[in-house]
């Protein structure tokens, strides 16, 4: 079988399609994040309405809100710590892969 060399226009089309695919992937992830965020807001309001009962004082409602806020702030802190740990592991793996690649290149020479 004979392979034909792609023309310049074919290469441009490939690059254009690849960029479009990546842009669509980023947009899909962005929309999915917005969906998750709004679903969380709906759940938060549902939870809040479960706690608030008729005849409660403003102070009691504010106490519930403050408690929920504290819980969410703690979760954010936990996620920040987890993200830092994952990033450190990713960097360590990248260093190992780079070292392995350099060892392989050294053997090939």
UniProtKB/Swiss-Prot annotation:
Similarity comment: family membership: Belongs to the pole-localizer TmaR family.
Miscellaneous comment in the UniProt entry for this protein: Overexpression of TmaR leads to the formation of chained cells, suggesting that the cells cannot complete division. Overexpressed TmaR forms filaments.
Protein name: Pole-localizer protein TmaR
GO cellular component entries: cell tip; cytosol
Organism: Escherichia coli (strain K12)
Entry keyword annotation includes Calcium: no
SS bond partners: none
Activity control: Regulated via phosphorylation. Phosphorylation of TmaR on Tyr-72 is required for the release of PtsI from the poles and for its activity. Only phosphorylated TmaR can release PtsI from the poles, since the diffuse non-phosphorylated TmaR binds to PtsI quite irreversibly.
Domain notes: The two helices, which seemingly fold into a coiled-coil, and the C-terminal region are probably all necessary for TmaR condensation.
Effect of residue 91 to H: Fails to form clusters and presents a diffused pattern throughout the cytoplasm. Shows a reduced swimming ability, is completely impaired in swarming on semi-solid agar and has a dramatically reduced ability to form biofilms
GO biological process: one example: regulation of protein localization to cell tip
Residue(s) carrying Phosphotyrosine: 72, 79
Gene designation per UniProt: tmaR
Effect of residue 95 to E: Does not affect cluster formation
Disrupted-gene phenotype: Cells lacking this gene are hyperactive for PTS sugar consumption. In the absence of TmaR, PtsI is diffuse, released from the poles, and, therefore, more active in sugar uptake. The absence of the gene also leads to detrimental effects on the ability of cells to survive in mild acidic conditions, probably due to PtsI hyperactivity. Absence of the gene severely impairs the capacity of E.coli to produce flagella. The mutant shows a reduced swimming ability, is completely impaired in swarming on semi-solid agar and has a dramatically reduced ability to form biofilms.
Top-rank taxon, per record: Bacteria
């Amino acid at each position: 079988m004979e392979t034909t060399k792609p023309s310049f226009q074919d290469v441009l089309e490939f690059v254009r399609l690849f960029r479009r695919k990546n842009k669509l992937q980023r947009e899909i992830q962005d929309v999915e994040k917005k969906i998750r965020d709004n679903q969380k807001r709906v759940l938060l309001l549902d939870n809040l309405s479960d706690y608030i009962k008729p005849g409660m004082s403003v102070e009691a409602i504010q106490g519930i809100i403050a408690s929920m806020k504290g819980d969410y702030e703690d979760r954010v802190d936990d996620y920040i710590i987890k993200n830092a740990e994952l990033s450190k592991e990713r960097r360590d793996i990248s260093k190992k892969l780079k070292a392995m690649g350099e060892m392989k290149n050294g053997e090939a020479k």
